[in-house]
């Protein structure tokens, strides 16, 4: 009897050990497999649009195991759009209105990730011109670039909100490039201009008699009941975002930290901006950073002001937002 009991106990032990081994093997099999290697491709633009990404470009970013990041700095938006549409680029910093255009063009496959700069437009004027507000432009002539695009729509909106008719109450001489407006101011051929950064810093440094007369972001908020002028955004490939939520989360956290770093330490930020190929002059970059309104605004917080901005642009030219104001699906990453 005693031998029989021992045999039974031995069998039980064997069964128990077998069960434990089976559980260990099953547990091991259920562990997450290592992430498939992937390269996250990110596009941005030279100038203010790309400034907030400079630290990430120079120092790199950790997006997790087997994930590498490849940044491209382009001189113009049209150098990035085809790659964003095709899905080759998973993320891209672009003018806000172009984000809307791409959302409509891809039938919702390009969506909002964040807002990364507010307005970078300013009215600059000779200190003798007597301009300190939009209303002061009545009867004046200004030089500007960006005809047929966002700068023109922003200027016209603010003139009209201040009771001025473009081309009637204010003469606007459009030139092809921002640099042409700077040249005219420097030569004394013009005394008032609308310019974006860093061209504002370029002319005010070169000609101390030229001052910032109107911050167009502040004028926009005053004219639109507090709505922000959100001029550039980070857009994201929707399919990729849904398949890689943790990678996207890490990117956004790193992006916000990079933006904070540039704003908190402009001198170091300027070095990174030059090293990243976003600007060529560190001194100019450092002076321009405070006026570039570099921000990180998550989708949920950006939606109301951005929707109002798109609505205003569409009122001037529907093509500016791709034919129609983006619907709720554009803001899906904020849900």
Locations of the language-model features?
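Short, glycine-/small- and polar/acidic-enriched structural segments
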Residues: 35-165, 172-174, 191-197, 213
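Solvent-exposed, polar/charged alpha-helical surfaces in well-ordered, non-transmembrane soluble domains
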Residues: 51-59, 78, 82, 86, ...
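Pocket-lining segment of extracytoplasmic ligand-binding domains
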Residues: 97-98, 179-272
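Short, solvent-exposed loop/beta-turn-alpha elements that line the ligand-binding surface or hinge
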Residues: 61-66, 218-227, 294-303
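A bilobed periplasmic-binding-protein/Venus flytrap-type ligand-binding module shared by bacterial periplasmic
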Residues: 55-57, 121-131, 229-246, 298
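Conserved C-terminal helix/tail region of periplasmic/extracytoplasmic solute-binding proteins
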Residues: 307-335
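Short, low-complexity disordered leader/linker segments with a strong preference
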Residues: 1-39
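Secondary-structure end/capping motifs
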Residues: 241-316
């Amino acid at each position: 009897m005693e031998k029989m009991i021992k045999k039974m106990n031995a069998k039980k032990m064997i069964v128990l050990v077998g069960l434990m081994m089976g559980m260990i093997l099953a547990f091991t099999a259920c562990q997450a497999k290592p992430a498939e290697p992937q390269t996250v491709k990110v596009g941005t633009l030279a100038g203010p649009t790309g400034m907030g990404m400079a630290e990430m470009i120079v120092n790199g970013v950790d997006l997790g195991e087997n994930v590498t990041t490849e940044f491209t700095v382009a001189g113009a938006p049209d150098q990035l759009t085809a790659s964003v549409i095709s899905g080759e680029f998973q993320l891209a910093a672009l003018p806000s209105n172009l984000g809307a255009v791409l959302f409509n063009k891809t039938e919702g496959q390009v969506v909002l990730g964040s807002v990364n700069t507010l307005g970078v437009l300013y009215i600059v004027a000779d200190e003798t011109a007597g301009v300190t507000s939009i209303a002061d432009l009545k009867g004046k002539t200004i030089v500007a670039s960006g005809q047929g695009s966002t700068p023109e729509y922003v200027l016209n909106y603010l003139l009209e909100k201040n009771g001025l008719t473009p081309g009637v109450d204010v003469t606007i001489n459009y030139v092809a490039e921002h640099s042409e407006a700077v040249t005219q101011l420097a030569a004394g051929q013009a005394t008032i201009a609308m310019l974006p950064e860093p061209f504002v810093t370029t002319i005010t440094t070169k000609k101390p008699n030229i001052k910032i007369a109107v911050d167009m972001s502040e004028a926009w908020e005053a004219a639109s009941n507090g709505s922000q002028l959100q001029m550039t955004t980070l857009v994201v490939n929707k399919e990729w975002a849904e398949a890689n939520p943790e990678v996207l989360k890490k990117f956004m956290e790193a992006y916000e930290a990079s933006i904070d770093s540039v704003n908190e330490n402009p001198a170091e930020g300027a070095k990174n901006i030059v090293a990243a190929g976003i600007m060529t002059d560190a001194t100019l970059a450092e002076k321009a950073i405070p006026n570039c309104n570099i921000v990180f605004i998550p989708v949920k917080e950006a939606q109301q002001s951005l929707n109002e901005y798109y609505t205003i642009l569409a009122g001037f030219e529907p093509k500016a937002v791709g034919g129609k104001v983006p619907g709720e699906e554009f803001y899906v990453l904020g849900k």
